Amino acid sequence: MSNVLQDIFKDHYEEMLYILHPRKSVIENVDRMINCGDPSFGGAMYGCSKCGTFKFVPFRCHSRFCPICGTKYSIDRTTSMSFKIINAQHRHCVFTIDSELRHFFLENRKLLGLLFDAVQSVIFRAFYKDNKSECFTPGFILVLHTFGRDLKWNPHIHCLVSEGGIGNSGLWRSKKHFNYTFLRNAFRTALLDLMEKELGVSFKKVKARCYQEHKHGFYIYAKPNKCNPKIVTKYIG
């Protein structure tokens, strides 16, 4: 039995293929999703040794794009993240980029990894600045979202970071104040430097324009919100 999403893509498959010209990975995931649960693609037969009843279970596609398999993946992922969160107050932060940079990540998906590298370096530096000898280390989880609420391409990083960290002495130190000026400027600098290193001299003009148009850095949401880590992991997962 097909679901609504499968029916939509089956009805408009050729339009998607010949008008939108999606990437190979997109086509592969759509194909898998369309055929998910189709008995003609195989399955497993289970039998009860007591009553003699047999049940055939068709194979699933295991694609995150699939509304059935993707939901299971999301549940497993959020469960895994919840086990890794330390018992401390956390802050939900969102790191965004200049709209002019978005097409670079759309055309080369490998660049998305730079977002993680940039955010990670900023978080470590923010805690390091508090006490350079102790070098406090926080606990944090980074999750990439590639689309905004309007469903348009808008890669950004959601970060769940502990409001405190462990120092070299083994002591825990709380951190309630997050310096917005530092976070915005540091993230802008870290990301643009990484992109220039990856893209070469052709990126220099774009980099200079970003500094000129974003003198206060890229927008970052990091307000104190007393977030419930379990609720946030469900959202960002």
Which residues does each PLM region occupy?
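Beta->alpha loop/short-helix hinge microenvironment recognizer with preference
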Residues: 1-237
